[in-house]
C-alpha cells in the first residue's frame, strides 16, 4: 500500500469519525438539551410572533429538578413560565403556552379575567384580547364557545399545569383540552435566534428580534 493511499484512507476515516461524533452530539443535544421550535400561530402574541424561531431549553424542567444543587440549574415549572409541551388533542404536535396555574391552584376565568383562589391576577403585561365580546355561560351556546371567557372554578390536579395563550381570545389551550401533565412538558424558550415575516415576503426578516429573550 502506497503512502498516499494510506494517508487518504486515514483522512476519510477521520472525517467519518468526526461526522459520526457530530451526529451523535446533535441527537443528544436535541433529545436532552436544546431544540429548535417555530411559532406557527398568533396565539402567543405579542410575546411571540408567527415566524419566530426559538431555541428551547429541554433540560431546565428535568424530573430531578433541584436534586443536583447549583451545579445543574433545574427547577419546577412556575406560574408565568413559558413552556412547550406535547399536544393533548394531537400528540404529534408540540405547543407553546404560558403556565398560569400549578397543581393545587383553583382556576377561574370570569368575563375573560383570570382568578386564582378567587383573587384576580394582573396579566396586563402580556395578555391581549382581540374580541371585545364576552360570552357568558349559556344553555343556548355550545360549551366550547363560552369556555373562552367563562371557566371554572376548577382545581389543577397533582402533577399538572394550567396553560393559556397570551392572545387569549384566539388561543386553544387548557380551557378546552384541560390541564397539562408535567410529564408532557418539554422545555422553556431560551431566545429567538431568527424571525421571518412571511406575509411581508420571503426575505423580510425581523432582525431586531434576533437574540430576543421571550418573557
Predicted regions located by residue number:
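Alpha-helical transmembrane spans of integral membrane proteins, capturing the lipid-embedded, hydrophobic core
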Residues: 15-19, 23, 27
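Soluble "head" domains of membrane/secretory-pathway proteins
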Residues: 2-13, 28, 32-215
Amino acid at each position: 500500500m502506497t503512502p498516499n493511499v494510506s494517508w487518504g484512507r486515514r483522512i476519510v476515516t477521520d472525517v467519518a469519525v468526526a461526522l459520526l461524533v457530530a451526529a451523535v452530539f446533535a441527537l443528544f443535544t436535541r433529545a436532552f438539551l436544546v431544540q429548535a421550535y417555530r411559532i406557527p400561530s398568533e396565539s402567543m402574541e405579542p410575546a411571540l410572533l408567527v415566524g419566530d424561531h426559538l431555541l428551547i431549553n429541554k433540560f431546565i424542567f428535568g424530573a430531578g429538578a433541584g436534586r443536583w444543587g447549583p451545579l445543574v440549574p433545574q427547577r419546577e415549572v412556575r406560574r408565568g413560565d413559558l413552556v412547550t409541551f406535547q399536544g393533548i388533542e394531537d400528540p404529534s404536535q408540540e405547543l407553546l403556552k404560558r403556565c398560569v396555574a400549578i397543581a393545587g391552584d383553583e382556576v377561574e376565568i370570569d368575563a375573560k379575567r383570570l382568578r386564582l383562589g378567587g383573587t384576580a391576577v394582573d396579566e396586563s403585561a402580556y395578555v391581549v384580547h382581540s374580541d371585545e365580546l364576552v360570552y357568558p355561560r349559556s344553555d343556548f351556546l355550545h360549551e366550547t364557545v363560552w369556555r373562552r371567557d367563562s371557566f371554572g372554578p376548577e382545581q389543577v390536579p397533582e402533577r399538572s399545569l394550567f396553560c393559556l395563550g397570551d392572545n387569549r381570545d384566539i388561543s386553544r389551550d387548557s380551557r378546552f383540552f384541560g390541564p397539562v401533565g408535567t410529564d408532557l412538558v418539554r422545555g422553556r424558550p431560551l431566545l429567538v435566534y431568527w424571525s421571518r415575516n412571511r406575509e411581508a415576503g420571503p426575505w423580510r426578516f425581523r432582525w431586531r428580534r434576533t437574540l430576543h429573550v421571550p418573557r
